[in-house]
């Protein structure tokens, strides 16, 4: 058995069960483990309660239980500058951003990784459900987590080869119930703590209220594609392509009772387009354009790739042809796709391997740009 005691692994600990078990497994495998709690957001609520303080207490309890040193580090400025400003700019531009992708790229695997290196880390580890496989020449491949329902490679798709070289994902070969069981067997205080949801580091706040603190709402008209006025919308930033709830129109406008969906936006005129039917024509597209395209391994400047892709988290893979030129790509779908949303990530896969991805700029229907921004 190899001696891991000389290998230092710095674990990003959130106070949740996944990162707790990550630290536990590495400690059991004999690594020199240090736990780090990242404070990335000032989340004091109206009652003066800071959930980060509660989470840090959980980190302290687990670190003490498994016998590892721990520290807290503040990345609020980095998060604001690198993730939150981007998040607001995307909403201003009528897009629907995915802050978790940017948070992993800029905070968890950049600011945190850089900090870990100052502590003498050989690797960093997180509680993400993903796997890394290392070739003999040192190349690292990022693979899907074994738990298909929890696989998080979609959110890790912007990581570079250099970042992956320094990363371990100890939970990648486990399913979520197994992780909880390990936590319970070890008597970890976080064993029954519920999973966090909501925006990366912002938590479970009411999204509409939260966003209105930073961006002024700009109500406008809600129209059908053929020009019928359906009332007022609350502000384009509150709606995403393909959304059903929150429109307030129901079946009161005559015709059939099929549900209404957001089928388009016009930022220049502040119009929200709505239509009836899950597969409304305006929601379907045959290709997309992406920018900030990036691969986890070295690739040529220009090439064509046949692979599968995801256009949102937990979506089944779809067959695509990808024409890459620099950091841009045209992605052509084998079958029409529904609600391709500007600002979201498109992520490429070859079987189990996550190859990388980009951010969706526009969707096209038979060569015509869809009115989604």
Curated annotation (Swiss-Prot):
The active site is at residues 103, 200. ATP binds at residues 12-19, 38, 127. It is found in: Cytoplasm. The record marks 128, 344 as: Interaction with tRNA. One of its GO terms (biological process) is tRNA wobble position uridine thiolation. GO terms for cellular component: cytoplasm. Its EC number is 2.8.1.13. Keywords: ATP-binding, Cytoplasm, Disulfide bond, Nucleotide-binding, RNA-binding, Transferase, tRNA processing, tRNA-binding. Disulfide bonds join 103-200. Coiled coil: none annotated. It catalyses: S-sulfanyl-L-cysteinyl-[protein] + uridine(34) in tRNA + AH2 + ATP = 2-thiouridine(34) in tRNA + L-cysteinyl-[protein] + A + AMP + diphosphate + H(+). GO terms for molecular function: ATP binding; tRNA binding; tRNA-uridine 2-sulfurtransferase activity. Residues 98-100 are annotated as: Interaction with target base in tRNA. Residues 150-152, 312-313 are annotated as: Interaction with tRNA. Catalyzes the 2-thiolation of uridine at the wobble position (U34) of tRNA, leading to the formation of s(2)U34. Belongs to the MnmA/TRMU family. This is tRNA-specific 2-thiouridylase MnmA. It comes from Streptococcus pneumoniae (strain P1031). The gene is mnmA.
């Amino acid at each position: 058995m190899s001696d891991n005691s000389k290998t230092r692994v710095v674990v990003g600990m959130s106070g949740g069960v996944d990162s707790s078990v990550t630290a536990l497994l590495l400690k059991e495998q004999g690594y020199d483990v240090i736990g780090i709690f990242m404070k990335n957001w000032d989340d004091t609520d109206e009652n003066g309660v800071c959930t980060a303080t509660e989470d840090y207490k959980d980190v302290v309890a687990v670190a003490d239980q498994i016998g590892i040193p721990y520290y807290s580090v503040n990345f609020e400025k980095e998060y604001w500058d690198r993730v939150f400003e981007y998040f607001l700019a995307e909403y201003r531009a009528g897009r629907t951003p995915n802050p978790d992708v940017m948070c992993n790229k800029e905070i968890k695997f950049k600011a945190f990784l850089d900090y870990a290196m100052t502590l003498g880390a050989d690797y960093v580890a997180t509680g993400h459900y993903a796997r890394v496989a290392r070739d003999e020449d040192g190349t690292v491949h990022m693979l899907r987590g074994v738990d298909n329902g929890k696989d998080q490679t979609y959110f890790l798709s912007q990581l570079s080869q250099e970042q992956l070289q320094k990363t371990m994902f100890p939970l990648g070969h486990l399913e979520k119930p197994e992780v909880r069981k390990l936590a319970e067997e070890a008597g970890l205080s976080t064993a029954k703590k519920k999973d966090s949801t909501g925006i990366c580091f912002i938590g479970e706040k009411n999204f509409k209220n939260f966003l209105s603190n930073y961006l002024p709402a700009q109500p406008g008209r809600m129209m059908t594609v053929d020009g019928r006025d359906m009332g007022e919308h609350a502000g384009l930033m509150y709606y995403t392509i393909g959304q059903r709830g929150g429109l307030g129109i129901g079946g009161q406008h005559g015709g059939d009772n099929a549900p209404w969906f957001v089928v388009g936006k016009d930022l220049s005129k502040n119009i929200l387009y709505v239509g009836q039917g899950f597969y409304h024509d305006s929601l379907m597209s045959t290709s997309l354009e992406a920018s900030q395209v990036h691969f986890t391994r070295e690739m040529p400047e220009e090439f064509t790739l046949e692979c599968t892709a995801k256009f949102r988290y937990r979506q089944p893979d779809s067959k695509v042809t990808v024409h890459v030129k620099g950091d841009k790509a045209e992605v052509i779908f084998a079958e029409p796709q529904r609600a391709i949303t500007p600002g979201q990530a498109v992520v490429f896969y070859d079987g189990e391997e996550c190859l990388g991805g980009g951010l969706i700029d526009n969707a096209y229907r038979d060569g015509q740009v869809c009115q989604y921004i």
